[in-house]
Amino acid sequence: MIWNQSIECMDREQLREIQSRRLVKMAEYVYHNTPFYRKKFQEMGLEPGDIKSIDDIVKLPFTNKLDLRDNYPFGLAAVPMSQIVRIHASSGTTGKPVVVLYTRKDLAMWAEAISRAFTAYGATKDDIFQVAYGYGLFTGGLGAHDGATNIGASVIPISSGNTQKQMTLMHDFGATVLCCTPSYAMFLGEAMRECEWPREEFKLKIGAFGAEPWTEKMREKLEESLGIKAYDIYGLSEIAGPGVGYECECQHGTHLNEDYFYPEILDPNTGEPLPEGTLGELTFTHLTKEGMPLLRYRTHDLTALHYDKCACGRTLVRMDRILGRCDDMLIIRGVNVFPSQIEDVILKLPEFEPHFLLIVDRVNNTDTSELKVEVKEDYFTDDMATMVGLQKKLEAELRSVIGLGFKVKLVEPKGIERSTGKAKRVIDNRKL
Protein backbone atom coordinates (compact mmCIF):
# COMPACT_ATOMS: atom_id res chain seq x y z
CA MET A 1 0.00 0.00 0.00
CA ILE A 2 1.12 3.57 -0.69
CA TRP A 3 0.12 6.56 1.44
CA ASN A 4 1.03 9.39 -0.96
CA GLN A 5 1.38 8.01 -4.47
CA SER A 6 1.89 11.41 -6.11
CA ILE A 7 5.12 11.91 -4.14
CA GLU A 8 6.34 8.39 -3.43
CA CYS A 9 6.02 7.33 -7.09
CA MET A 10 6.86 10.67 -8.72
CA ASP A 11 8.99 10.83 -11.87
CA ARG A 12 12.55 11.46 -10.70
CA GLU A 13 13.08 14.47 -12.96
CA GLN A 14 9.97 16.07 -11.53
CA LEU A 15 11.13 15.22 -8.00
CA ARG A 16 14.51 16.80 -8.74
CA GLU A 17 12.75 20.01 -9.83
CA ILE A 18 10.88 20.10 -6.51
CA GLN A 19 14.12 19.48 -4.61
CA SER A 20 15.83 22.29 -6.52
CA ARG A 21 13.06 24.79 -5.79
CA ARG A 22 13.04 23.86 -2.14
CA LEU A 23 16.82 24.04 -1.77
CA VAL A 24 16.94 27.51 -3.37
CA LYS A 25 14.25 28.65 -0.96
CA MET A 26 16.00 27.00 2.01
CA ALA A 27 19.32 28.72 1.26
CA GLU A 28 17.56 32.09 1.41
CA TYR A 29 15.64 31.05 4.52
CA VAL A 30 18.62 30.00 6.66
CA TYR A 31 20.73 32.96 5.51
CA HIS A 32 18.12 35.43 6.70
CA ASN A 33 16.84 33.53 9.76
CA THR A 34 19.75 31.58 11.26
CA PRO A 35 22.78 33.69 12.28
CA PHE A 36 24.92 30.54 12.50
CA TYR A 37 24.43 29.82 8.79
CA ARG A 38 24.67 33.45 7.75
CA LYS A 39 28.13 33.55 9.34
CA LYS A 40 29.07 30.28 7.61
CA PHE A 41 27.96 31.65 4.24
CA GLN A 42 29.94 34.84 4.76
CA GLU A 43 33.08 32.95 5.81
CA MET A 44 32.83 30.89 2.60
CA GLY A 45 32.09 33.91 0.41
CA LEU A 46 28.75 32.33 -0.44
CA GLU A 47 25.53 34.20 -1.25
CA PRO A 48 22.08 32.60 -1.20
CA GLY A 49 21.77 33.51 -4.88
CA ASP A 50 24.69 31.18 -5.65
CA ILE A 51 22.35 28.24 -4.97
CA LYS A 52 20.37 27.82 -8.20
CA SER A 53 19.53 24.09 -8.18
CA ILE A 54 19.97 20.92 -6.18
CA ASP A 55 23.31 20.42 -7.96
CA ASP A 56 24.65 23.38 -5.98
CA ILE A 57 24.17 21.60 -2.66
CA VAL A 58 27.90 20.79 -2.67
CA LYS A 59 28.57 24.52 -2.21
CA LEU A 60 26.77 24.59 1.14
CA PRO A 61 28.56 24.21 4.49
CA PHE A 62 28.48 21.02 6.53
CA THR A 63 26.78 20.79 9.92
CA ASN A 64 27.70 18.30 12.63
CA LYS A 65 26.61 17.34 16.13
CA LEU A 66 29.26 19.58 17.70
CA ASP A 67 27.62 22.59 16.01
CA LEU A 68 24.34 21.69 17.71
CA ARG A 69 26.02 21.35 21.10
CA ASP A 70 27.96 24.60 20.67
CA ASN A 71 24.68 26.40 19.95
CA TYR A 72 22.79 24.82 22.88
CA PRO A 73 19.95 25.25 23.52
CA PHE A 74 18.24 27.39 20.86
CA GLY A 75 21.10 28.95 18.88
CA LEU A 76 20.07 27.25 15.62
CA ALA A 77 16.41 28.27 15.81
CA ALA A 78 15.17 29.90 12.61
CA VAL A 79 11.91 31.19 14.10
CA PRO A 80 10.96 32.93 17.37
CA MET A 81 10.33 30.52 20.24
CA SER A 82 6.69 31.60 20.18
CA GLN A 83 6.38 29.53 16.96
CA ILE A 84 8.04 26.42 18.43
CA VAL A 85 5.43 23.92 19.62
CA ARG A 86 7.68 20.90 20.42
CA ILE A 87 11.20 20.52 21.81
CA HIS A 88 12.96 17.15 21.64
CA ALA A 89 16.48 16.35 22.78
CA SER A 90 18.90 13.45 22.61
CA SER A 91 21.68 12.79 25.08
CA GLY A 92 25.27 13.35 24.07
CA THR A 93 28.65 12.16 25.29
CA THR A 94 29.42 15.63 26.63
CA GLY A 95 26.41 15.54 28.93
CA LYS A 96 24.86 18.42 27.00
CA PRO A 97 21.79 17.28 25.02
CA VAL A 98 21.30 17.90 21.31
CA VAL A 99 18.13 19.98 21.06
CA VAL A 100 15.68 19.79 18.13
CA LEU A 101 12.89 22.31 17.54
CA TYR A 102 9.58 21.85 15.70
CA THR A 103 6.93 24.26 14.49
CA ARG A 104 3.35 23.10 13.96
CA LYS A 105 4.12 22.67 10.25
CA ASP A 106 7.22 20.59 11.09
CA LEU A 107 5.13 18.21 13.19
CA ALA A 108 2.62 17.82 10.35
CA MET A 109 5.48 17.05 7.93
CA TRP A 110 6.91 14.49 10.37
CA ALA A 111 3.54 12.77 10.82
CA GLU A 112 3.16 12.63 7.02
CA ALA A 113 6.59 11.00 6.69
CA ILE A 114 5.78 8.34 9.30
CA SER A 115 2.36 7.74 7.74
CA ARG A 116 4.13 6.75 4.52
CA ALA A 117 6.17 4.23 6.51
CA PHE A 118 3.29 2.64 8.40
CA THR A 119 1.20 2.39 5.23
CA ALA A 120 4.09 0.72 3.42
CA TYR A 121 4.14 -1.90 6.18
CA GLY A 122 0.47 -2.65 5.52
CA ALA A 123 -0.99 -0.80 8.51
CA THR A 124 -4.35 1.00 8.23
CA LYS A 125 -6.82 2.92 10.37
CA ASP A 126 -8.16 -0.44 11.56
CA ASP A 127 -4.91 -1.34 13.35
CA ILE A 128 -4.01 -0.98 17.02
CA PHE A 129 -0.46 0.31 17.57
CA GLN A 130 1.48 -0.54 20.72
CA VAL A 131 4.14 2.18 20.89
CA ALA A 132 6.89 0.80 23.14
CA TYR A 133 9.51 3.36 22.19
CA GLY A 134 10.35 5.72 25.02
CA TYR A 135 8.09 8.76 25.25
CA GLY A 136 9.47 12.13 26.31
CA LEU A 137 12.55 13.90 24.96
CA PHE A 138 13.41 10.90 22.74
CA THR A 139 11.70 11.28 19.35
CA GLY A 140 10.69 7.63 18.95
CA GLY A 141 7.57 7.46 21.10
CA LEU A 142 5.80 10.66 20.13
CA GLY A 143 6.91 10.35 16.50
CA ALA A 144 5.39 6.88 16.10
CA HIS A 145 2.33 8.00 18.08
CA ASP A 146 1.63 10.97 15.79
CA GLY A 147 2.23 8.92 12.64
CA ALA A 148 -0.20 6.22 13.74
CA THR A 149 -2.78 8.83 14.74
CA ASN A 150 -2.37 10.49 11.34
CA ILE A 151 -3.45 7.34 9.51
CA GLY A 152 -6.43 7.04 11.85
CA ALA A 153 -5.22 4.02 13.84
CA SER A 154 -5.72 3.37 17.55
CA VAL A 155 -2.65 3.91 19.74
CA ILE A 156 -1.60 2.33 23.04
CA PRO A 157 0.97 4.86 24.36
CA ILE A 158 2.63 2.41 26.74
CA SER A 159 6.22 3.64 26.26
CA SER A 160 9.17 1.34 27.05
CA GLY A 161 9.74 -0.92 30.04
CA ASN A 162 7.37 -2.81 32.37
CA THR A 163 7.50 -5.93 30.24
CA GLN A 164 4.72 -7.80 32.05
CA LYS A 165 2.35 -4.91 31.41
CA GLN A 166 3.48 -4.83 27.78
CA MET A 167 2.43 -8.45 27.35
CA THR A 168 -0.86 -8.01 29.23
CA LEU A 169 -1.99 -5.00 27.20
CA MET A 170 -0.71 -6.49 23.95
CA HIS A 171 -2.89 -9.52 24.63
CA ASP A 172 -5.95 -7.85 26.16
CA PHE A 173 -6.13 -4.86 23.79
CA GLY A 174 -5.37 -6.91 20.68
CA ALA A 175 -2.39 -4.86 19.49
CA THR A 176 -1.59 -5.55 15.83
CA VAL A 177 1.47 -3.30 15.32
CA LEU A 178 4.47 -3.10 17.66
CA CYS A 179 6.81 -0.09 17.57
CA CYS A 180 10.08 -0.30 19.55
CA THR A 181 13.81 -0.90 19.22
CA PRO A 182 14.77 -4.28 17.74
CA SER A 183 16.72 -5.21 20.88
CA TYR A 184 13.66 -4.57 23.05
CA ALA A 185 11.53 -6.50 20.57
CA MET A 186 13.85 -9.49 21.11
CA PHE A 187 13.23 -9.13 24.84
CA LEU A 188 9.47 -9.01 24.25
CA GLY A 189 9.77 -12.12 22.09
CA GLU A 190 11.33 -13.94 25.05
CA ALA A 191 8.55 -12.63 27.30
CA MET A 192 5.90 -13.86 24.87
CA ARG A 193 7.33 -17.39 25.01
CA GLU A 194 7.24 -17.35 28.81
CA CYS A 195 3.92 -15.58 29.41
CA GLU A 196 0.64 -17.20 30.44
CA TRP A 197 -0.97 -16.97 26.98
CA PRO A 198 -0.10 -19.00 23.89
CA ARG A 199 1.22 -16.97 20.96
CA GLU A 200 -1.87 -17.82 18.93
CA GLU A 201 -3.96 -15.61 21.24
CA PHE A 202 -1.96 -12.50 20.28
CA LYS A 203 -3.04 -10.49 17.23
CA LEU A 204 0.34 -8.90 16.51
CA LYS A 205 1.19 -8.91 12.78
CA ILE A 206 3.56 -5.99 12.07
CA GLY A 207 6.74 -4.77 13.76
CA ALA A 208 8.17 -1.27 13.11
CA PHE A 209 11.66 -1.39 14.58
CA GLY A 210 14.33 1.31 14.58
CA ALA A 211 16.67 3.58 16.59
CA GLU A 212 19.58 1.12 16.33
CA PRO A 213 21.20 -1.01 13.61
CA TRP A 214 19.97 -4.59 13.19
CA THR A 215 20.67 -7.42 10.78
CA GLU A 216 18.69 -9.69 8.47
CA LYS A 217 19.33 -12.59 10.84
CA MET A 218 17.83 -10.56 13.67
CA ARG A 219 14.81 -9.87 11.46
CA GLU A 220 14.32 -13.62 11.05
CA LYS A 221 14.56 -14.13 14.81
CA LEU A 222 12.02 -11.37 15.52
CA GLU A 223 9.56 -12.66 12.95
CA GLU A 224 9.84 -16.16 14.35
CA SER A 225 9.55 -15.20 18.03
CA LEU A 226 6.73 -12.64 17.68
CA GLY A 227 4.87 -14.13 14.72
CA ILE A 228 5.07 -10.88 12.73
CA LYS A 229 6.45 -9.26 9.60
CA ALA A 230 9.32 -7.05 10.78
CA TYR A 231 10.15 -3.73 9.08
CA ASP A 232 12.95 -1.24 9.56
CA ILE A 233 12.09 2.42 10.18
CA TYR A 234 15.01 4.83 9.92
CA GLY A 235 15.46 8.21 11.50
CA LEU A 236 17.54 10.44 13.71
CA SER A 237 16.42 13.19 16.05
CA GLU A 238 18.43 15.93 14.38
CA ILE A 239 16.59 15.45 11.08
CA ALA A 240 13.10 14.56 12.37
CA GLY A 241 13.08 11.27 14.26
CA PRO A 242 11.64 7.99 12.93
CA GLY A 243 10.19 8.25 9.44
CA VAL A 244 13.15 9.77 7.63
CA GLY A 245 13.18 6.45 5.80
CA TYR A 246 11.20 3.22 5.67
CA GLU A 247 11.08 -0.20 4.06
CA CYS A 248 8.36 -1.22 1.61
CA GLU A 249 6.93 -4.71 1.14
CA CYS A 250 9.87 -5.61 -1.14
CA GLN A 251 12.39 -4.94 1.65
CA HIS A 252 15.17 -4.25 -0.85
CA GLY A 253 16.38 -1.16 0.98
CA THR A 254 14.97 1.77 2.90
CA HIS A 255 13.09 4.44 0.92
CA LEU A 256 14.09 7.94 2.03
CA ASN A 257 11.56 10.79 2.12
CA GLU A 258 13.82 12.87 -0.09
CA ASP A 259 11.18 15.50 -0.81
CA TYR A 260 11.74 16.58 2.81
CA PHE A 261 15.26 15.35 3.59
CA TYR A 262 17.81 15.44 0.75
CA PRO A 263 20.43 12.67 1.12
CA GLU A 264 24.05 12.55 0.01
CA ILE A 265 26.74 9.91 0.46
CA LEU A 266 30.16 11.32 1.28
CA ASP A 267 33.65 10.03 1.80
CA PRO A 268 33.81 10.21 5.62
CA ASN A 269 37.43 11.37 5.52
CA THR A 270 37.37 13.97 2.72
CA GLY A 271 33.71 15.02 2.66
CA GLU A 272 33.61 14.52 -1.11
CA PRO A 273 30.41 13.09 -2.70
CA LEU A 274 30.60 9.43 -3.70
CA PRO A 275 28.93 7.69 -6.70
CA GLU A 276 25.66 5.78 -6.48
CA GLY A 277 26.03 2.41 -4.78
CA THR A 278 29.25 3.34 -2.96
CA LEU A 279 29.48 2.87 0.80
CA GLY A 280 29.99 6.15 2.63
CA GLU A 281 28.67 8.57 5.22
CA LEU A 282 25.02 9.59 4.94
CA THR A 283 24.32 13.34 5.02
CA PHE A 284 20.94 15.11 5.05
CA THR A 285 19.75 18.61 4.16
CA HIS A 286 16.34 19.82 5.27
CA LEU A 287 14.28 21.06 2.34
CA THR A 288 11.12 22.18 4.17
CA LYS A 289 11.79 22.40 7.91
CA GLU A 290 10.94 25.71 9.61
CA GLY A 291 11.95 25.49 13.26
CA MET A 292 15.57 24.36 13.02
CA PRO A 293 16.63 23.48 9.47
CA LEU A 294 20.05 21.90 9.00
CA LEU A 295 22.31 21.95 5.94
CA ARG A 296 24.36 18.88 4.97
CA TYR A 297 24.11 17.34 8.43
CA ARG A 298 26.68 14.56 8.81
CA THR A 299 24.91 11.60 10.41
CA HIS A 300 28.00 9.34 10.71
CA ASP A 301 25.77 6.49 9.47
CA LEU A 302 27.51 4.31 6.88
CA THR A 303 25.41 3.13 3.93
CA ALA A 304 24.93 3.41 0.15
CA LEU A 305 22.12 4.83 -2.03
CA HIS A 306 20.34 3.36 -5.09
CA TYR A 307 18.17 5.42 -7.46
CA ASP A 308 16.61 2.76 -9.70
CA LYS A 309 12.84 2.31 -9.44
CA CYS A 310 11.72 -0.19 -6.81
CA ALA A 311 9.48 -3.13 -7.69
CA CYS A 312 6.89 -1.67 -5.29
CA GLY A 313 6.42 1.27 -7.69
CA ARG A 314 8.13 3.87 -5.52
CA THR A 315 10.79 6.04 -7.11
CA LEU A 316 12.12 7.47 -3.84
CA VAL A 317 15.81 6.64 -3.40
CA ARG A 318 16.61 3.41 -1.55
CA MET A 319 19.23 3.19 1.17
CA ASP A 320 21.10 0.02 2.08
CA ARG A 321 20.81 -1.25 5.64
CA ILE A 322 23.04 0.83 7.91
CA LEU A 323 26.35 -1.01 8.32
CA GLY A 324 27.23 1.00 11.41
CA ARG A 325 28.41 4.47 12.30
CA CYS A 326 31.72 6.15 11.63
CA ASP A 327 31.88 6.94 15.34
CA ASP A 328 30.72 3.41 16.32
CA MET A 329 33.48 1.79 14.36
CA LEU A 330 36.17 0.34 16.58
CA ILE A 331 39.76 -0.09 15.47
CA ILE A 332 41.13 -3.07 17.38
CA ARG A 333 44.72 -4.04 16.61
CA GLY A 334 44.41 -2.28 13.26
CA VAL A 335 41.17 -4.01 12.24
CA ASN A 336 37.94 -2.05 11.65
CA VAL A 337 35.17 -3.68 13.71
CA PHE A 338 31.46 -2.85 13.69
CA PRO A 339 29.07 -4.21 16.35
CA SER A 340 26.68 -5.18 13.53
CA GLN A 341 29.32 -7.58 12.15
CA ILE A 342 29.58 -9.33 15.51
CA GLU A 343 25.80 -9.60 15.77
CA ASP A 344 25.60 -11.09 12.28
CA VAL A 345 28.12 -13.82 13.16
CA ILE A 346 26.33 -14.69 16.42
CA LEU A 347 22.93 -14.89 14.75
CA LYS A 348 24.21 -17.38 12.17
CA LEU A 349 25.04 -19.89 14.91
CA PRO A 350 22.03 -21.68 16.46
CA GLU A 351 23.61 -22.14 19.90
CA PHE A 352 23.69 -18.45 20.84
CA GLU A 353 21.22 -15.73 21.78
CA PRO A 354 21.60 -12.35 19.98
CA HIS A 355 22.73 -10.65 23.20
CA PHE A 356 26.39 -9.76 23.58
CA LEU A 357 28.74 -7.29 25.24
CA LEU A 358 32.14 -6.41 23.78
CA ILE A 359 34.69 -5.08 26.28
CA VAL A 360 37.78 -3.51 24.72
CA ASP A 361 40.82 -2.55 26.78
CA ARG A 362 44.51 -1.82 26.36
CA VAL A 363 47.06 -3.80 28.37
CA ASN A 364 50.81 -3.16 27.99
CA ASN A 365 50.11 -1.09 24.84
CA THR A 366 48.19 -3.97 23.25
CA ASP A 367 44.44 -3.98 22.55
CA THR A 368 42.42 -6.73 24.21
CA SER A 369 38.86 -7.71 23.27
CA GLU A 370 36.57 -9.83 25.43
CA LEU A 371 33.20 -10.78 24.01
CA LYS A 372 30.49 -11.96 26.40
CA VAL A 373 27.78 -13.96 24.61
CA GLU A 374 24.67 -15.70 25.93
CA VAL A 375 24.23 -19.40 25.23
CA LYS A 376 20.69 -20.56 24.50
CA GLU A 377 19.03 -22.54 27.28
CA ASP A 378 18.91 -25.73 25.18
CA TYR A 379 22.69 -25.62 24.70
CA PHE A 380 23.86 -24.33 28.09
CA THR A 381 25.40 -27.12 30.18
CA ASP A 382 27.72 -27.80 33.11
CA ASP A 383 29.82 -30.01 30.86
CA MET A 384 33.07 -28.07 30.48
CA ALA A 385 34.18 -29.81 27.28
CA THR A 386 30.91 -28.92 25.54
CA MET A 387 31.11 -25.27 26.57
CA VAL A 388 34.75 -24.99 25.51
CA GLY A 389 33.75 -26.44 22.15
CA LEU A 390 31.06 -23.77 21.72
CA GLN A 391 33.55 -21.08 22.71
CA LYS A 392 36.13 -22.27 20.17
CA LYS A 393 33.45 -22.53 17.47
CA LEU A 394 32.39 -18.91 17.94
CA GLU A 395 35.97 -17.65 18.18
CA ALA A 396 36.83 -19.38 14.90
CA GLU A 397 33.78 -17.95 13.11
CA LEU A 398 34.55 -14.42 14.35
CA ARG A 399 38.16 -14.69 13.21
CA SER A 400 37.06 -16.00 9.80
CA VAL A 401 34.51 -13.23 9.17
CA ILE A 402 36.06 -10.21 10.90
CA GLY A 403 39.73 -11.13 10.74
CA LEU A 404 40.37 -10.61 14.44
CA GLY A 405 40.79 -12.90 17.42
CA PHE A 406 38.27 -12.34 20.23
CA LYS A 407 38.42 -13.86 23.70
CA VAL A 408 34.89 -15.25 23.98
CA LYS A 409 33.28 -15.67 27.39
CA LEU A 410 30.05 -17.66 27.37
CA VAL A 411 27.36 -16.69 29.88
CA GLU A 412 24.13 -18.35 30.93
CA PRO A 413 20.76 -17.41 29.38
CA LYS A 414 19.70 -13.88 30.42
CA GLY A 415 23.18 -13.31 31.83
CA ILE A 416 23.51 -10.04 29.91
CA GLU A 417 21.41 -7.12 31.09
CA ARG A 418 18.48 -6.25 28.82
CA SER A 419 17.73 -2.72 27.65
CA THR A 420 14.29 -1.23 27.06
CA GLY A 421 15.82 1.30 24.68
CA LYS A 422 18.97 1.16 22.58
CA ALA A 423 21.11 -1.82 23.54
CA LYS A 424 24.58 -1.06 24.95
CA ARG A 425 26.81 -3.49 23.10
CA VAL A 426 30.32 -2.04 23.55
CA ILE A 427 32.42 -0.86 26.48
CA ASP A 428 35.70 0.67 25.30
CA ASN A 429 38.02 1.24 28.26
CA ARG A 430 40.97 2.39 26.17
CA LYS A 431 42.16 5.96 26.59
CA LEU A 432 42.35 6.86 22.90
Positions of PLM-derived features:
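Conserved S/T- and glycine-rich ATP-binding loop of Class I adenylate-forming
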Residues: 30, 90-93, 129, 178, ...
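AMP-binding/adenylate-forming
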Residues: 103-117, 128-187
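Conserved helix-loop-beta element of the AMP-binding
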Residues: 128, 195-214
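AMP-binding/adenylate-forming catalytic core of the ANL superfamily
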Residues: 178, 288-404, 421
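Adenylate-forming
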Residues: 185-203, 220-225
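Conserved AMP-binding/adenylate-forming
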Residues: 205, 214-309
